[in-house]
């Protein structure tokens, strides 16, 4: 038996295939394994209730199959205060936040980590994220997952090296088809369950309708880059840079039939600015300013750094130069122009397979 037999790991069981296989792999590695199902949303919503009940039943079925205990905990208050309120605040300000990043920071790797250690006596927590970790020179690095299509390091850049050191990511070493194959071989209840794509913990629902419950819509003009009013939007919060669908406008009478894209949001005047064509110059930026910086395994940046950046999930890496500014912000200059750089989203930095950290995009640079 490996020396892992003295170590207790609590796996965050979501009711999905990745966390299910993670629990199995840790068992195979000799750890003492138990599961924890987190309930994070309390709003009165029958659809969500059904989905959460199904997820809990699936998590329980997997734990029964593997012969491990499943604990449950309610983090709804923490989620509301530390994730959802901030999410609404960002939308109110006309920015487009990423709730999954916030949720990982505040719930999965803070509330869960603390609860597992203090209440359940865990040495480690584990999740079904497609990332890896590496211990090197007395610190722990966060690495991209082996499966480039599923790599989730973009969503975990806010973790400290201490949090990474207390976390295990078993499926990060595998490709997704292999994870599905293992689940099928074990006849796990989640083997064929589709991946969730909704807002972290709130599930899949009609986003516009959902947001409208919490934020009053503020209709305004849709204006072309030349200043012509061509329609009305129902609220800037429903639109993001680079968006093409859902604008409700066709070609202009004398102009081209090329689709319209959102190229800017004038927050002061509540105006949505659009242009035709996916390669319109107004869609592109040469850089960005980022704030709320977090570096996984290093102190704040003291000198310019050559690395690569992603300004959204699943984007190809963009070579860039990162320069620290005086007020705990950074300026990032891309080697080539990048489309749809969106304030409120995260810019995440890499050197080869290592995720260095990132920050929130404050403004995009067009000069």
Swiss-Prot record:
GO terms for cellular component: cytoplasm. Keywords: ATP-binding, Cytoplasm, Disulfide bond, Nucleotide-binding, RNA-binding, Transferase, tRNA processing, tRNA-binding. Residues 98-100 are annotated as: Interaction with target base in tRNA. Catalyzes the 2-thiolation of uridine at the wobble position (U34) of tRNA(Lys), tRNA(Glu) and tRNA(Gln), leading to the formation of s(2)U34, the first step of tRNA-mnm(5)s(2)U34 synthesis. Sulfur is provided by IscS, via a sulfur-relay system. Binds ATP and its substrate tRNAs. HAMAP family: tRNA_thiouridyl_MnmA. The lineage of its organism: Bacteria, Pseudomonadati, Pseudomonadota, Gammaproteobacteria, Enterobacterales. It comes from Edwardsiella ictaluri (strain 93-146). This is tRNA-specific 2-thiouridylase MnmA. GO terms for molecular function: ATP binding; tRNA binding; tRNA-uridine 2-sulfurtransferase activity. Disulfide bonds join 103-200. It is found in: Cytoplasm. The active site is at 103 (nucleophile), 200 (cysteine persulfide intermediate). Interacts with TusE. Belongs to the MnmA/TRMU family. NCBIfam families: PRK00143.1 (NF001138), trmU (TIGR00420). Transmembrane segments: none annotated.
């Amino acid at each position: 038996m490996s020396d892992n037999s003295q170590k207790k790991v609590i796996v965050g069981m979501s009711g999905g295939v990745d966390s299910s296989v993670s629990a199995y792999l840790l068992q195979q590695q000799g750890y003492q394994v138990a599961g924890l199902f987190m309930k994070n949303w309390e709003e009165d919503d029958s659809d969500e209730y059904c989905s959460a009940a199904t997820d809990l039943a699936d998590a329980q079925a997997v734990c029964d199959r593997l012969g491990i205990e499943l604990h449950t905990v309610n983090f709804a208050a923490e989620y509301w205060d530390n994730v959802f309120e901030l999410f609404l605040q960002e939308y109110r300000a006309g920015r487009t936040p990423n709730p999954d990043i916030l949720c990982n920071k505040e719930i999965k790797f803070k509330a869960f980590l603390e609860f597992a250690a203090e209440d359940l006596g865990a040495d480690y927590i584990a999740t079904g994220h497609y990332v890896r970790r590496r211990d090197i020179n007395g610190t722990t690095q966060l690495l991209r997952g082996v499966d480039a299509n599923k790599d989730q390091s973009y969503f975990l850049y806010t973790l400290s090296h201490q949090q990474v050191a207390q976390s295990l990511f078993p499926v990060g070493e595998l490709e997704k088809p292999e994870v599905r194959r293992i689940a099928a071989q074990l006849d796990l209840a989640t083997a064929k369950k589709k991946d969730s794509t909704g807002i972290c913990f709130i599930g899949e629902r009609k986003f516009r309708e959902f947001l409208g419950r919490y934020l009053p819509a503020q209709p305004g003009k849709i204006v072309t880059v030349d200043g012509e009013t061509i329609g009305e939007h129902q609220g800037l919060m429903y639109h993001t840079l680079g968006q093409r669908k859902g604008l409700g406008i066709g070609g202009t009478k004398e102009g081209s039939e090329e689709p319209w894209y959102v190229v800017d949001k004038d927050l002061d005047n509540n105006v949505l600015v659009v242009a035709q064509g996916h390669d319109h110059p107004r869609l592109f930026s040469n850089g960005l300013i980022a704030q709320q910086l977090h570096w996984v395994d290093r102190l704040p940046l003291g000198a310019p750094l050559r690395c690569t950046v992603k300004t959204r999930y699943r984007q190809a890496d963009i070579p860039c130069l990162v320069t620290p500014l005086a007020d705990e912000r950074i300026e990032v200059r891309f080697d080539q122009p990048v489309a749809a750089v969106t304030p409120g989203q995260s810019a995440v930095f890499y050197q080869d397979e290592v995720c260095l950290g990132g920050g929130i995009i404050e403004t995009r640079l067009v000069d």
